[in-house]
Structure formats: C-alpha cells, structure tokens
C-alpha cells in the first residue's frame, strides 16, 4: 500500500468501520455460523434507558466536566459529567448522579479538534465523528483538558483488543476460517505461519458503537464470512496467512508487515504458477510499492484468531436481529446452506499438504443459494423464477460441491468498480479465464426477470456467477443508473466497511454515491475491462428499465380503466345510485358555486398574502429611502458648512487642509449615499408598482365578489360564503390603509372603475365595520328585524326598514375639517377625523359597540335628529356633494364656530328631513342599486398624510385665533345677538361680533333666492376668500401687532352708547362713514367664511392669484389700524366729556347682512358685553 494510500487511509480509518453497538457481546452457543435468534435486549445504544450498561468493575480511564452540544439541533451546550470507561463515553448530569444520561461507544470514532468547516465558534472544542453516526461536539474548559480528552478518547477509539477468551469452541474456529479459500487463489504471501499469527479483525470493534446501518448490508449479505478479506488468504493455498494480510478496508487499525521483507513477493507454493493477469505479482491485498511495508509495520500485528469467534457470534446475532425485525424466515428454511451442504469440502489434490486443520464442516453455497441478507428482498417479496430453481437442482445433482470457475464481470462505472479478473481454483483443472459475457448474460437474465424492489437492492447471493462474488453489482431496476466517476470501492466486499444502518425503514439504498470510496488496491476482486461488455451492459440496463416503466404505466392505465368501469356499473345498477342521481344533494347553483368559491378562497388567500408581503416590502423600502434622504440632507448641510468655513478661514495656515480633508470625506459619503438612495428609490418604485398591481387585482376580485353577491341567487350558504370573502378582503385592505395612512391605501385612484366597492375605508358598504354588510338590502343575511332578515328574500321590495343612508360628509377621506378644539360641552357636535382619537371615537360611536353603532347609523328611528353631525349631514344632495368636492379641492376646511348658532338649531330638523328624503330618493329603491354613501364616482384625492393634516390643523387654529382676536378690536356690532343666547350656557365667556353675525348672515342668505343681486359683491368676496388658502406665516407680524394694539387703549363699557357733543366736520363724517362701511364689509367676510354657500360654490369663478391674497391681507391690516386709531381717539374724547350718547355710525350707513333680523332690537342692548376684554 502506497504512502499516499496509507495517508488517505489514516485519515478515514476510524470512520469507515462498522460501529455495531447494537449487538451485545454474547458468546456463541452453536458451532453453526448462524446462531439462533436473540432477543431484542441485545440492543444497547442511545440515551437514558437505551444507553449501554456501564461495567462497574471496569477502571475509569478519564472523567471530568465537558460541555456537549445538544442533539436537538439548537446551538446549545450542556455541561455534563463525562466518564470514559471500557472504550465507551458515559455522561451524567453531575458527578454524584448514578442514572446515565447517555452513552457514546467510541470504537471507530475519529476524535480531533474542530475545523473551520464545522462552524463552531466555542473555544476548546473537539469532536468525535463517524461516517454513519452523527458527529458529537465537546468543549473543554481549558486547552490542556481538551488535549487530554482528545488523547484519551482517541486511544479508546483505536482500541487494540488484547488476547483473551482462549476457550472459544473449536467448531467456531471452523466456522471462522472456512470461507477463506473458496474465493482467492494462492498468492505470494501465503507462506506466513499459522493461525495464531492471524491478524485480529476490526469487526470485533463492531460489536459496540452506534451504528448507522450501512455496513450491515454486508454483515447479513454474507454473515458467515465477515472477515472474508483477511481470511480468504489464510487457507487458499493450504497455508494459513500470517500478519502480512492487509487490514480490512476501513478497519480502525492497519495490520503489521505482511512478510519479513516488507515488500517482497515470495514464489507461489506448490508450484502454483499463476498470478493474476490483470495484476501481475499481486496478492489479494497487493502493496503498490515497497514502502507500504513500513506503513504497515507502524501498527501492531493482529493475532489471536480466537477473538474472531466472539466477533462472529456478535455478527450472527446482529443478522438474526435484523431478520427478526424484517420477518425473514429462520436459517432452517430451504435456502439455508446448512440444510444442503453439511459435507466436507472438496479441494484439489495439490492442496492436501497444506489443507486447513478444519477440513470438516466447511460449508459451501451452490450457485444462487446464499443466505438471505438484510440487503436482499424479503423472502415473502421474492419468488424464485423457474430457472433459478432449475439451476439449484442442477447444482445439487452435480455433486453437491462447488465448481471452481472464473467469472469475469465488467462492472458498470455507476458502481465505481475497478476492472480486472478474479482467480478461482477449480478442483479438476488449472485456473483459466472464461469469456466475459458468461457471467454478464446470466446475471442480466436474472435482472430482467426478478421482481422490482424499491426499498432494498437485490441480494448478492441471487446470481449464478462465481461464489467469489461478494455482492451482485447488478441492482434492481429501481437503483440509480446515473454515471458516477470510476472509483475503487470495496464497500460491498466487506461488512466492516459498511456499518449498521440508521433505521430499518430509512431509505438508505436510494442513492449509492454517498458510500465512501476506498483506495485502490485494497479490494482484491478486480474485473476485466471490456468496452463491448460495458456498452452492452448500458444498453441492456436501459432497455430493461424502459420495459419496466412501460409495464408500470400500462398497469396504471388498465387499473384506471377498470376503476372507472366499476364506478359506472355501480352507478347504473344500484337503486340508491339512481335515487341520488334523480335527486341531487344540493341545488345545481350551489354545487357549482361552492367548488368555485373553495378555489376562490385559496386564490384570495394567496393574493392577500402577496399583497401584505409586498406592503411590508414597500414599507421597509420607504423607511430606507427616508433614512437615506435624511443622511443625504445632513451630508449636504455639512458640506455647505464646510464651504462656508473654507471661505471664512481659508487664509489661516493648516486650517484649510483639515477642511479640505473633511470636505473630501463628506463628498465621498455623499456619493455613496446618493448611489444607495438611487438604488433604493428604484427598488421602491418597482415595489410600489407591484403593490399597486396586486391592489388592483384585489380590488377587481372584491368587485367581482360584490357583483356575485348582488346576483339574485336564492342561496343563503353561497351568499354567506361570498360575504365572508368580501369581509376578508376588506379587513386586509382596511388594515393596510390604517397602517399606511401616508400612502393612501383606500384605492382612491380605482374608484372610477371599481363600481359598488370603490373605497375600502372602514365605512365601505360591504365592510365588516359598516352596516352595509349587515343591513343592506344586498346582504343575504340581514341583522335588522323585519322582512330584511329573511335570507331567502334579501331584496324584497316590501321591506319596512329604510335603506342604508350614505355616510356623513365628515367621513369622506378626501379632505377633513380642521381640528380646532371645541368647548367641552360641545365636543360631541364636532368630531375631528384627523385627531388621534378620531378612529376610536368615530368607529365605536363614543363607546358604543360597533354593531350598535352601525345599526344606529343605519336606522334613523334609533337616532335622535340632533344627535351628531352625521345626523345633520346624513344624505347630501348632488349639489352638496359637488360643493363638498369643490371645497375639498380648494383645501380650505370648514372653520367651526365656537358655539352653535340658534339659526343652525332651527334649521337642523328641516335639514334632516330634507336630506333624509333625498337620501331615500337617491338610495336603494331596487335590488340592483346600492347606496352610494359618500363615495364619489369620479375622480378623488388621496388621503392626506399625517404631516399635511398637522399642517392644516396649525393653519386653521392660527386663523381662528387671529379672527377671534381681531374681532375684539371692532368698535361696533352691526347685529345684536339673538334672544336665544342663554341657551348655550357659555360660562364667563362673551361672544365676539363675528360669532353673533353668523346666525344673522346665515338667515339672510337662506332667506334670499339664489338669483338675488343685492349682496352679490360681498358674496363674491366671501367666496373668493373661501377658496383662498392664506398661509399662517403671512400673519406672524400682523397678529402680534394686532394683539398689542388694544392693550394701549382703555375702552369703557359706555363707549358704543356715547356720541360726542361736538359735531364733526363733513370731511370727518365722510371719512367715518367710509370706515364704518369697510368695517361692516370685513365683518361680513369674516362671518361668511364659516358658511358654505350651498349650490353656489361651482358657479363662482374666483381668481386664485397671490396678488388678490396680498390685497385682501393689506385691506384687513388697514382696517385693523383704522379701528385702533378710531378707538383711541374716541377713548380720549370720552375721558374728557360724558355727554349725550350718539351712535358712532351714521343712520344712513347700510348694514345689509343684518337689517332683516335686527330691526326689532335696540342696538346697544348688549354692547357692554360685546367689547369687554
């Protein structure tokens, strides 16, 4: 064996060997090789109850604390107390505990430190690995302990069994050595002296250890010859082979020197003139070069063949245990060789001088009669074809003994065999080479006729070629025929190379490529290389596989035809079948629709899952883009500061260098950030497109389901299924909309084409949070009492309950009113959708359950007409909807008054009646229509983001406070307050002039016809101001100026009722009259900002340029200054003289907005309260 080969073997020597800890070391009780069945108590491996029993008398090799990686797959390390006794590692919870947590037989394990490929980051870690068992990882507390454990465990794994148990029965010795000479011709190394030098075979190590179930393929394939590799040389020439025989493939310890000379090849004994033609001068285990002797001499020689008996008995027990598990018949059946061949063997005459000392009871196997192995098909699954029985009878008639022949076999490269011939002695003639096709044809004939076995390949015993065949290379057609690179594997030749399989039922033979290769030269049976046989083999195998597959396909097709015929016969003949055919179990519509909706349910689940997943992706990408943008802006600002510093301090020495270095670093970072930002933006765009497509699909699916729900299908179950699907979709969409308010997931862009389910807000008609899905006439199972509750007649025209009224305008997500906080006692009148608690208060109806809230929204009989604004604004007419849309597009919300005007209260009942009537006319009058609610069929605006909403809140608050404080400076109230003022219970608060004017102005405007021209100019100005959005920062300086001006003037309560005695000049009167007119105009403007001109918003064409805004702003500032000046002058005059009161305004001064309502009231009745600060 070469150094290269030896090196390779040394690396894998401990991992290739069977580690049969499943079989206890029970001495054999029969001379027969196949011992009786043993009980299942022979199994001892694993953890706790399945762990091995510790020998209390055995000395403790090493003990200590180690960390062991948990076997659960989790990277968890458990501290355990480990004790190494008798080549087995036991571990406990602590040193005082007696119950064993587990045992690890270390035989044939390879113990070494961990490698980087193991991905173990813990310090002082080492491993014990085996080819067929999982790798155990241990961690010590110091490197010294690690080295000590590695050394101790390594020695236990490389155990050399001392000579013992010399009292092995003699028949067992017969059984140990009988299979030797039947396979291998005499070689040059067969001159070694006798049996007591016979090397110890590694399978003794297989009596213990955690096996993985691969090697026992050989162990039971030829259970009587587990050491065939070694002992085939022992008596092949009549001379027992000495320690020169090579170690078994995969044995944990190589053998000693084969011959005294190490690499010499003595002459063949007894005139044997033949050496293997394909391997000149080779033995069964030929060394490749002379230095292999040194390699072998480095290991102790194997002696004491008596130990083999113990190992053999263990292997027999293993075989019987596996047979017992698989239900294989006992060895006394027809195929047992002991039944046919209890006769002495026949050997050539020239073998007699060197014959074995055990000439008797050497049993042979006839061609095709080998004991069953675990790798063969079960006995009940294999029926011998006639030719097999014929061959068996023929072999029995021909003398009962084996005929030594040479069969040459070209193995397919898929089994990785080396090519060569096998020498087999014949009793009647010198060895010759037979034609290669002899064995191939016979074996292929058996392959084509034997039944398929999907689980286990065929046994090597089922072939008529040579008994030297340790295994049959021709597997069942279910085996894989993919071409693997040629390699020299002796894994089939020796059970030691194939350890016990992991599980009896595991699919371990499906793939042959994971079997470990063995270096060339260790396998003595080489087969000849012949391209013709090789090609013919491939063709025959492919043809046979194709035939088998075609046969299976034909059987399947015939079975399907037969099944369908039987079904038809049953259906046509059975009276019950006729009855069921006549009376279908379900209506046809339901039967078809149920299956459809089962499919739709799966599609909906997949689609909604994709939508949510894509939404998460988009949100993460948005967050990344925002983060990158913030970083970019910070870098740009830092660079800007650096540029400024360079301009300022560029002349200072050494300072510009630092700035330049800093600038360069910032520029590099900025470039990287911009690259990342561009990539993230592109990814976000693509993800958004995908998300929108998915959203469109969900919307289309929702519309389709809604249309199917609207169909006149009188089926409650089907309608419930559809309704459930709609709810599922809307739940997801509403959740996405609420979680992503900035992106506007209410699908406003699809509203034009979505039809009945345009919006996915929480008030969607089919939403589970709204009342449409419960009480709409389209709903198949209404929860409202009356005929609406009948699921079979969901659309009956005589239903007593009114149709669902559309949602109030405050719910429309296009635009929201400002969030001026109302008074505590008036908060219920003004909910603000943009406030954080809006969704909670709005959806739950101020603490009520959602169902009750939906029912109260639905049924006017359960709600008071003056309850909430959703009752006031129940059903907007078309003009109101258009006006509301226009107002939303102008981005100016309705500024609510601080108190509710009496005119509004007086108007509320009629407005409710009128709008409810319109809602009845515009709502559902037939089955095909559904309430439009507040959904616009045309274009819409996506919901504002949170930042925009907060900005609007600040603007409206600032504007409201400005208007209120400016009103405190006005000298007079053009309209006295109505008589219903005490009904509002405003404590310690006096209403300002513009609040008093609102009711009068609204009454005047509502009393007039739309075509009136008396107040056209103020209306145009009011509409223009209504459409303008004045930014609050424009008032920053002016508000402070206006707030500071009244503090400098003391205005007494009697100011408005007093008139100075001194008459004014005509110029002063004209100027004063002009100022009063301007003041009244301003009052009209400020008061009309709170009124929406219903029906007039679309007809007014108002410019939106910034110049008009600035002009109006300047006009207001001038009026404020004039008012302050006038008040100051009047205050000074009143402080000197208190004479007859005279009104500050001329009797001729017009007050158009308030005259119709204020003629019956004294002007100064409430003036003292009006101007009180």
UniProtKB/Swiss-Prot annotation:
Q: Where is the composition biased (Pro residues)?
A: 815-824, 1141-1155
Enumerate the residue ranges of region (Disordered).
Answer: 1-39, 163-346, 737-872, 888-984, 1093-1114, 1130-1173
Phosphoserine is found on: 247, 251, 314, 459, 461, 472, 665, 864, 901, 925, 973, 979, 992, 1065, 1142, 1146, 1149
Modification type Phosphotyrosine: residues: 492
Question: Which residue stretches does the UniProt record annotate as biased composition, category Basic residues?
Answer: 953-967
Q: Per the database record, which ranges form the PH domain?
A: 59-158
| Feature: compositional bias, Basic and acidic residues | 201-233, 940-952
Query: Would I find Phosphoprotein among this entry's keywords?
Result: yes
Bias class Low complexity marks the residues at 761-782, 789-799
Q: Which UniProt keywords apply?
A: Phosphoprotein
Annotated Gene3D superfamilies = Pleckstrin-homology domain (PH domain)/Phosphotyrosine-binding domain (PTB)
**What protein is this chain from?**
Pleckstrin homology domain-containing family A member 6
Gene name in the database record: Plekha6
């Amino acid at each position: 064996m070469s150094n290269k080969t030896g090196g390779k073997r040394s690396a894998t020597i401990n991992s290739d060997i069977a580690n049969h800890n499943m079989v206890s070391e029970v001495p054999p009780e029969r001379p027969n090789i196949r011992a009786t069945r043993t009980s299942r108590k022979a199994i001892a491996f694993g953890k706790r109850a399945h762990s091995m029993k510790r020998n209390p008398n055995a000395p403790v090799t090493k003990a200590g604390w180690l960390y062991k990686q948990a076997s659960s797959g989790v990277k968890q390390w458990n501290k355990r107390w480990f004790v190494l006794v008798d080549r087995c590692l036991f571990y406990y919870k602590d040193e005082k505990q007696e119950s064993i947590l587990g045992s690890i037989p270390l035989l044939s394990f390879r113990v070494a430190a961990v490698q980087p490929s193991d991905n173990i980051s813990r310090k002082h870690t080492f491993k014990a690995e085996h080819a067929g068992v999982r790798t155990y990882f241990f961690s010590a507390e110091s490197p010294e302990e690690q080295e000590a454990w590695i050394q101790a465990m390594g020695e236990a794994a490389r155990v050399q069994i001392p000579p013992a148990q010399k009292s092995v029965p003699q028949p067992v010795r017969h059984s140990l050595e009988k299979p030797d000479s039947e396979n291998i011709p005499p070689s040059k190394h067969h001159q070694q002296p006798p049996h007591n030098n016979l090397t110890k075979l590694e399978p003794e190590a297989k009596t213990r250890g955690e096996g993985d179930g691969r090697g026992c393929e050989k162990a039971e394939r030829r259970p009587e010859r587990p050491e065939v590799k070694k002992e085939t040389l022992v008596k092949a020439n009549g001379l027992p082979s000495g320690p020169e025989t090579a170690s078994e493939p995969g044995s944990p310890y190589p053998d000693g020197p084969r011959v005294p000379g190490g690499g010499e090849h003595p002459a063949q004994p007894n005139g044997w003139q033949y050496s293997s033609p394909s391997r000149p001068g080779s033995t069964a285990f030929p060394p490749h070069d002379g230095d292999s002797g040194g390699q072998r001499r480095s290991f102790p020689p194997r002696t004491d063949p008596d130990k083999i008996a113990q190992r053999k008995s263990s292997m027999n027990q293993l075989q019987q245990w596996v047979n017992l598990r698989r239900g294989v018949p006992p060895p006394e059946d027809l195929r047992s060789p002991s039944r046919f061949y209890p006769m002495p063997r026949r050997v050539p005459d020239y073998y007699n001088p060197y014959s074995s000392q055990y000439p008797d009871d050497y049993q042979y196997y006839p061609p095709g009669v080998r004991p069953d192995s675990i790798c063969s098909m079960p006995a009940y699954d294999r029926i011998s074809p006639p030719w097999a029985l014929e061959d068996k009878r023929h072999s029995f008639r021909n003398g009962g003994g084996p005929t030594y022949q040479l069969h040459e076999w070209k193995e397919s490269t898929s089994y990785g065999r080396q090519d060569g011939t096998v020498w087999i002695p014949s009793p009647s003639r010198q060895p010759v080479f037979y034609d290669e096709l002899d064995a191939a044809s016979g074996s292929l004939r058996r392959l084509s006729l034997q039944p398929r076995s999907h689980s286990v390949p065929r046994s090597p015993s089922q072939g008529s070629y040579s008994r030297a065949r340790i295994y049959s290379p021709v597997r069942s057609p279910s085996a894989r025929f993919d071409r693997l690179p040629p390699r020299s594997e002796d894994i089939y030749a020796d059970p030691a190379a194939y350890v016990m399989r992991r599980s009896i039922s595991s699919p371990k033979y499906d793939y042959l490529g994971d079997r470990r290769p063995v270096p060339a030269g260790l396998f003595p049976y080489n087969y000849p290389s012949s391209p013709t046989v090789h090609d013919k083999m491939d063709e025959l195998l492919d043809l046979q596989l194709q035939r088998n597959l075609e046969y299976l396909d034909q059987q399947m097709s015939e079975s399907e035809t037969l099944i369908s015929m039987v079904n038809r016969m049953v259906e046509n003949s059975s009276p019950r079948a006729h009855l069921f055919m006549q009376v279908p179990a379900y209506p046809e519509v339901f039967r078809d629709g149920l299956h459809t909706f089962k499919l739709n349910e799966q599609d909906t689940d997949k689609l909604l899952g994709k939508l949510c997943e894509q939404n998460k992706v988009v949100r993460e990408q948005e967050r990344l883009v925002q983060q990158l943008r913030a970083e970019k802006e910070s870098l740009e600002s830092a660079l800007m500061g650096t540029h400024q510093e360079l301009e300022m301090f560029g002349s200072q020495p050494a300072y510009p260098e630092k700035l330049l270095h800093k600038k360069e670093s910032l520029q590099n970072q900025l470039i990287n950030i911009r690259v990342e930002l561009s990539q993230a933006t592109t990814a976000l765009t693509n993800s958004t497109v995908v998300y929108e497509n998915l959203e469109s699909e969900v919307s289309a699916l929702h519309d389709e389901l809604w249309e199917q729900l609207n169909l006149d299908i009188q089926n409650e179950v089907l309608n419930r299924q559809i309704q459930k699907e709609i709810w599922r979709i809307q739940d997801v969409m509403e959740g996405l909309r609420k979680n992503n308010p900035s992106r506007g997931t209410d699908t406003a862009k699809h509203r034009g084409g979505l039809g009945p389910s345009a919006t996915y807000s929480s008030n969607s008609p089919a939403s589970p949070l709204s009342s449409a899905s419960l009480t709409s006439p389209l709903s198949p199972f209404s929860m409202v009492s009356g005929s609406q509750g009948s699921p079979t007649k969901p659309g009956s025209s005589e239903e007593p309950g009114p149709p669902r009224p559309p949602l109030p305008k405050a719910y429309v997500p296009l635009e929201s009113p400002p969030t001026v906080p109302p008074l505590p006692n008036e908060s219920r009148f003004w909910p603000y959708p943009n406030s954080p608690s809006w969704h909670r208060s709005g959806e739950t109806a101020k603490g009520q359950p959602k169902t009750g809230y939906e029912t109260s929204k639905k049924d006017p009989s359960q709600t008071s007409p003056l309850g909430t604004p959703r009752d006031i604004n129940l059903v907007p007419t078309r003009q109101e909807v258009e006006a509301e849309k226009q107002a939303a597009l102008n981005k100016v919300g309705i500024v609510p008054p601080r108190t509710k005007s009496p005119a509004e209260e007086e108007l509320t009942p009629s407005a409710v009646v009128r709008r409810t009537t319109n809602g009845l006319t515009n709502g559902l009058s037939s089955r095909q229509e559904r309430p439009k609610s507040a959904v616009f069929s045309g274009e819409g605006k996506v919901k504002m983001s949170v930042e925009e909403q907060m900005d609007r809140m600040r603007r409206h608050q600032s504007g409201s406070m400005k208007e209120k404080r400016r009103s405190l400076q006005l000298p007079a109230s053009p309209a006295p307050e109505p008589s219903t003022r005490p009904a509002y219970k405003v404590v310690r608060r006096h209403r300002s002039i513009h609040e008093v004017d609102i009711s009068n102005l609204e009454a005047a405007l509502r009393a007039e016809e739309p075509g009136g021209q008396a107040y056209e100019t103020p209306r145009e100005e009011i509409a223009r101001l209504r459409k303008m959005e004045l930014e609050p920062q424009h008032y920053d300086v002016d508000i402070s100026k206006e707030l500071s001006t009244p503090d400098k003037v003391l205005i007494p309560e009697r100011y408005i009722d007093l008139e100075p005695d001194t008459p004014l000049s005509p110029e002063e009167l004209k100027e004063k009259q002009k100022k009063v007119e301007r003041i009244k105009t301003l009052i009209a403007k400020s008061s009309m900002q709170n009124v929406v001109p219903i029906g007039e918003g679309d007809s007014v064409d108002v410019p939106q340029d910034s110049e008009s805004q600035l002009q109006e702003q300047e006009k207001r500032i001038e009026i404020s200054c004039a008012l302050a000046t006038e008040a100051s002058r009047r205050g000074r005059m009143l402080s000197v003289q208190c004479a007859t009161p005279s009104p500050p305004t001329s009797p001729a001064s017009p007050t158009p907005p308030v005259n119709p309502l204020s003629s019956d009231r004294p002007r100064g009745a409430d003036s003292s309260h009006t101007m009180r600060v």
